[in-house]
Amino acid sequence: MAEAVDEDSGVGRSLEESSNGQHSQAGEALSEWRSSGQVENGTPSTSPSYWDIDDDDDYGLKPSELYGQYTWKIPKFSEITKREHRSNVFEAGGYKWYILIYPQGCDVCNHLSLFLCVANYDKLLPGSFAILEAGWSQFAQFTISVLSQDLKKSKFSDTLHRFWKKEHDWGWKKFMELPKLKDGFIDESGCLTIEAKVQVIRERVDRPFRCLDCGYRRELVRVYFQNVEQICRRFVEEKRSKLGRLIEDKARWTSFGVFWLGMDQNSRRRMCREKVDVILKGVVKHFFVEKEVSSTLVMDSLYSGLKALEGQTKNMKARSRLLDAKQLPAPIVSVDKDMFVLVDDVLLLLERAALEPLPPKDEKGRQNRTKDGNDGEEVNKEADERDERRLTELGRRTVEIFILSHIFSTKIEVAHQEAIALKRQEELIREEEEAWLAETEQRAKRGAAEREKKSKKKQAKQKRNKNKGKDKRKEEKVSFATHAKDLEENQNQNQNDEEEKDSVTEKAQSSAEKPDTLGDVSDISDSVDGSADILQPDLEDRDSSSVLWDTDALEIHPPSSEGSSRGRGISISTPNGITEGKSHSTMDDSSSTCSNDSIRSGVTNGSYQGNSLNFRNQKSPNKGKNQQVKAMTDAHSLASETDDQPSTLGTDPKGQNYSSEASNVGESDWVVVSHIQEPEGSRNRIPVGRERKTVQSIVNSVDMDRPKEKSTAVLSSPRNVAKNPSPLTQTKPEKKSISTADGIPNRKVLATGPPSSSQVVLPSDIQSQTVGLRADMQKLSAPKQPPATTISRPSSAPIIPAMRPSPITVSSSVQTTTSLPRSVSSAGRLGPDPSLHNQQTYTPQSYKNAIVGNSLGSSSSSFNHHPSSHGVVPTTLPSSSYSQAPTSSYQSSFPYSQDGLLWTGRSPSSVNMGMYNNTYSPAVTSNRSLNHMDVQIAQQQAQSMMTDEFPHLDIINDLLEDEQCSNMVYNGSIFNPQPQVFNGQYSSYHGELLSGGRTRSFGEEGLHYMARGPYGTDGMMPRQWQMTNMDLSLPAMRSNGMEDGTSSAANYHHSYFGLDASNPSFTSGINGYTEFRPSNGH
């Protein structure tokens, strides 16, 4: 433990020795001088009064009381074998000390190690001594020296250290080398002398304090004077340079001068004062450094300078050996009680402090420190006094500069910086205010400019609006005048239309008053009432089965008086389809005969606009159920019909729509001509003249629009049937289509279907007349159907042959049904079988073949007036199914019908298309003879009418003959070789009928072509066939409601019934021609 402490002390000592090398270099002379002066002389010091005075300080013990020294003589030093050797304990400054040496060195070799140690350090307690009030810790400065026989060569070392419990010893491990001890340090007896001087320092922190004893201080001044002077001069030069830079900076100096002079006297006086305690604390803190040996001398110098400064202030006269008054500079700082005050103006003091130099350095130094008797003593005393006065002056100047610098840097300069900052802030505020004012002015200018601009814009806008208002009023005036003019023209036009309508209505009423024998003529149909109810199922719900289709014939037996009293009210009710394979028709087996009332093939109610009627299929609201339609006819409706009403065919086999078109003689297109009933007052008539001007454009538009429709709607004018051949309708069994045409709102439709898969209903000349409904038919309710465009051709339009375009296909699926033997007459009377195969519609785009009508597969129907005197075709011909029936239909101008329906057709192209779809090769006849025969028949029927009742029929028949002949000539040849295919239903009798002709194969079309023979159909019909019990007024029935005399020419279709060799009704009749006799025997 002791070794470790000694080792540490040795390290401390060695370090302290190295730091005090200058003192060690003083040599033995200095050591001897110091020792001899103290020991031998013993006279009081001659230092200045402020240098040695410390009695005015009442802060504990004086430095002289805290000083002690001890000399230790070690005999026979060379014989010591111990590692360490201690001296006796001595007391200094209230502490007990001892000297510790290591003869062989402490942790070093060949060196002498010396340490000063505090005795009983482990027993020391805080506060045991007066000087240790703060505890066990003491600051002390001590000197250890090894005396030589020549005192000038003595070796010594000085150090400053704070002793405390863990650092209770301090010294030098390498104090000196062992070989040097033999150079006069060990005397002849082998004794080594070691001396220790200890100064316990009474430290303070609030002000400079006296540290050293006067004798000990003088000894240290001779060694460390230059160090003390350097410390003080460095500080003063630093402050002077700072002040000099301030003065050299003209701007700052001028600014500071302005600031300082701008301050009032009280402010300047207050700023030039500072408390003493504040200044002195700063002095002690700045200059006292514990590790510096010279710090004690610097503190003694400052203490002496502070005393000199205070003495100058008090004008103390008690001065011994001081510098003369002339040599003393003017003071900068004075002491006023507890305040340091600047004695003059700050500007002057700063210039003076910056320019006034410090006392010059002493370049001589001490050169001889040896003892030369009394002379030497006097010289040393003068040197000591001179050094002390210099240190006192350095201390005073240092304190003054420190006070001036502190007051300037902490008060005046800070105030100056604050003033500058405030001024700058004021300038910035002023600049901002100016900028704000300028911006406000600019904003005001911009606002005024914008307001002016807006005002101008507003004025311009108001001006534009004013001009617009004027222009608008002018335009309103002009438009009002134009509108008034248009209204006036419309009123005039309406008046003209009303007049024409009234004239037409009056003419129609006058024609309606003529007696009509239609009821007698159409005796072929069963006894039915003027109105009929029909159940019409949905198109999708039809059953494809053909087992019980013969039971679909609906017979309605109204009172017989109804048919006799109103012969013109003709009705027919036919099946319109099968729902889920079940018949929804009502059968009455009580009667199989025909009444005077004809079978109504369809009743169509609809609106009439212009020259056309619009028909459209409409599904019934509930699937699988029939829609019951009631239709009533009135005799007066015949008189109210116009020239423009078209006829249409309506069939719906297999739940799908079958569409066909009314056509002229010579074209193979089977169409059921419908009689349209319409309330008399609900029609809007268009004059014939206007119709004739627009019909060509309408026809073209309709022809172009037909391919876009899902179904084909065809109507032909009743008046112009002889002149206007209708387009072709062909069927295809593979394709299905639902005919949808624009229907007429608030109109109920009753349609019938043909009884065979290839049979299509065709209206005759008599049945092509359109019958109007009674007035009370307006009350009937029917589903509203959207309108479709229908066109009727005017009476006087020329017949122009048209090029046949590519066919437009409309397919409909057809079902066939087999008629029961029981219902032969019923099936024959009630209408065609609904089983029709698909047909392909071909529409020539020419005025001649203009299409007028609507879809035939929906609820459209026609009134077919059949002569009551003729019988029906017996059922010996078997009904073919869909797969067995030929797919091509023969559509001739002869309205052959096995069931008593009327058929018509033309268009050889339809035959060709039908032949490609047919698996059979039916017989062919020429088209020319059919056309010619129709003309003859129409003429003979017209001649057989009563002349007094119809005086204008001769003229009409002549016109028809001429026009028909022109048509045949225009077509290119009287012998038109284009084949006309009979309906497959006539395959059973065409052999007998045409047996006189010779057949040949027509390889191109795959059909049998029959040349015109004397016994063929074309040859055996030179004139009209006279039917038994035929009403001669039937061909003239249509003429009753015509506006002009040419209207009867349109009704050239004649009723030819089914021909069969086994049929007993097929007998010789009038004029040698075959006569049809009805099955009832009449």
Swiss-Prot record:
Topological relation to the membrane, as annotated:
Peripheral membrane protein
Q: Which SUPFAM superfamilies match?
A: TRAF domain-like
Coiled-coil stretches noted in the UniProt entry, renumbered to this chain: 446-507
What keywords are annotated for this sequence in UniProt? Answer: Acetylation, Cell membrane, Coiled coil, Cytoplasm, Membrane
Where in or outside the cell it occurs: the entry states:
Cytoplasm; Cell membrane
Specify residue ranges for compositional bias: Basic residues.
Answer: 454-471
Which GO biological-process labels does this protein carry?
autophagosome organization; innate immune response
* Description of the deletion phenotype: No visible phenotype under normal growth conditions, but the double mutant plants traf1a and traf1b, or muse13 and muse14 are extremely dwarf when grown at room temperature.
Q: Which CDD domains match?
A: MATH
List where Polar residues composition bias occurs: 33-49, 588-630, 645-666
Domain MATH residue range list: 67-198
Q: Name one GO cellular component term.
A: cytosol
Query: What function is annotated for this protein?
Result: Functions redundantly with TRAF1A in the regulation of plant immune response. Contributes to the turnover of the nucleotide-binding domain and leucine-rich repeat-containing (NB-LRR) immune receptors SNC1 and RPS2. May associate with an E3 ubiquitin-protein ligase complex, which modulates ubiquitination and subsequent degradation of NB-LRR immune sensors to maintain their homeostasis. Functions redundantly with TRAF1A in the regulation of autophagosome formation. Required for SINAT1- and SINAT2-mediated ubiquitination and destabilization of ATG6.
| Protein's name in the database | TNF receptor-associated factor homolog 1b
Gene source species: Arabidopsis thaliana
